Amino acid sequence: TIRDPQAIPEIFLYSDLVAAGLTDGPRIYSTGPGLFIIDQLNSYEKTKSRLEIYKNRYKTNYIKSYLVGNRKQRQWMIQASKELQLMPVTEGGADTKQDITHVLDGFTSNEHSLPNANIYKDVVQLFAQSNIQYTPTLLVSFGGPLPLFQFFAKENPFSNSKLRRFFPKDLLYNNTATRLLYFREEDYHVKDLSKGVNKIMAAGGNIALGGHGDMQGIQNHWEMWLLASGGMSPHNVLKVATINGAKALGLAADLGSIEKGKLADLIILDKNPLVDIKNSTSIIYVMKNGVLYSGETLDKVYPVKEAIKKPWWQMEKHN
């Protein structure tokens, strides 16, 4: 199950295709196109009118407030979302003071890390007691060099056989080959950011997982490893990646844990992630809604065996 917090409207068509069984894929939720300052939401009435499009036409429950303007404009977003029963999520914007107003004013989620590497009890308790979802997206952490490019260099995703199966080779290479943004190890402050995330979770706060979309599939594993780098236990990292994500989407009654009455979604690993969180990639099987898939190929193995359809770039005419 995924939620794209910034996408073109066609993502809702893709979501319908997956739900109807006409194509393979995860459950897809999205905010649709984010709202920005260029949308000129200069009155409450205009703000509500724009959000009604998302509620009535896109049939989504989520809206991305992408730095729509001053605090009053952001509050209009929250007020209109509440009236329309939408979940307003917001962009962090690399501004800690603004992030604090996001929490105080009532956004359901703050996405991207606080740029300040060290946070203290006041900020920790504010995030924890407000019940806001904090999705730090450490791969593109604010306030310092981006760990994403370090992963590109060290993990060499272009040589990953699974990624090569599910990505056109030229696209995979173009997305991951850059080594331009190189920094000395001591310049990175992601471990300190991760320590702050861990403080909020230890205080009872809600931490969710987000990979930013720069390297789909494996990016969430990298994000999990970064969460662990700041001292978060492997068990808590797994909670962030499962039940906490379901809570962030308002779907915890149906997803996020293995319980009676929930949808049969699970992942079977070959190695224990509680011993080493990097074992999270040792996926043998994936089950979605009771259908079991090979973790390597996504061929169906239960209750019926069926090979996945070849993607267009593997067809003969594209080779």
Language model segments and positions:
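Divalent metal-dependent hydrolysis catalytic cores, especially in the metallo-beta-lactamase
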Residues: 1-10, 25-35, 53-69, 78, ...
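Active-site-adjacent beta->alpha loops and helix N-cap segments on the catalytic face
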Residues: 7-17, 67-80, 118-129
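Acidic (Asp/Glu)-rich catalytic clusters
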Residues: 17-23, 55-56, 103, 125-129
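Divalent metal-coordination and catalytic microenvironments
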Residues: 28, 81, 110, 134, ...
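Active-site neighborhoods of metal-dependent hydrolases
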Residues: 38, 49-69, 115-230, 303-305, ...
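Short, acidic/polar
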Residues: 39-54, 93-100
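Acidic, glycine-enriched loop/beta-strand segments at the rims
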Residues: 218, 233-238, 248-283
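Extracellular/periplasmic ectodomains of large secreted or surface enzymes and adhesion receptors
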Residues: 289-319
